[in-house]
Amino acid sequence: MPPRQQPRRISRELALLSLSQINATPEKLEQIEINNLILAAIRTLTTESQDMLETAASEVTQGNERLLKSETQSANVQSARAMVSEALKLTQGAINRLAHAIELPEMIQLASQYEVREYALELIGAVNRRRTEIDQQLEAVLVDWQLNRLPKIDRDILRIAVAEILFLEIPNKVAINEAIEMAKRYSDDEGYRFINGVLRRFTERLRITNN
């Protein structure tokens, strides 16, 4: 059984995983049921898992081909090992995504479904309505990066955190910590460190602007 989590933490995960699939008007957003959010989230997780497994299979195939050539090209051995290592990481990532998909409905059952739904929809609505403004804020603090070049999951984690700080009156520290936790769960080591740095710069810029 998954551990009981606070409703808002589950809401953030639901919003993160549903953003790409729910683009409703504010009126239609209010009509979305919790089951629709769960379905959208599970679809996102399973799609990501399939993509990861396909990439892993490709890495294994290429690694095997390089091993077959290793008798004449010793450098191929190291390259093949790197490919197999990457394939293992991708496979583990896919397994983790599928585990989250299995856990999600039960996590919501253990929490207050009303609270989970309400805050998830509030987050989705805020991000969708104010996306241009949110993205401008993020572009201003990205160093040597463009927002549209980031992995989608990282972009949406950043958008949710900025929406919470700017429009939902969530304290900076809480929004950043929750974003880092989501990144640890759905991104990678580089991803969560990068997200932490971007949000720290964003809140510092906000502090200077407001003073």
From Swiss-Prot:
Recorded GO CC terms: cytosol
Transmembrane segments: none
Coiled-coil spans in chain: none
Recorded superkingdom: Bacteria
GO MF term (any one): RNA binding
Keyword RNA-binding attributed: yes
Pfam families per UniProt: NusB
Claim: RNA-binding is one of the keywords in the record: yes
GO BP annotations listed: DNA-templated transcription termination; transcription antitermination
Annotated keywords: RNA-binding, Transcription, Transcription antitermination, Transcription regulation
HAMAP family linked to this entry: NusB
Family the entry assigns: Belongs to the NusB family.
Function: Involved in transcription antitermination. Required for transcription of ribosomal RNA (rRNA) genes. Binds specifically to the boxA antiterminator sequence of the ribosomal RNA (rrn) operons.
Protein name (database record): Transcription antitermination protein NusB
Source species: Rippkaea orientalis (strain PCC 8801 / RF-1) (Cyanothece sp. (strain PCC 8801))
Gene name of this polypeptide: nusB
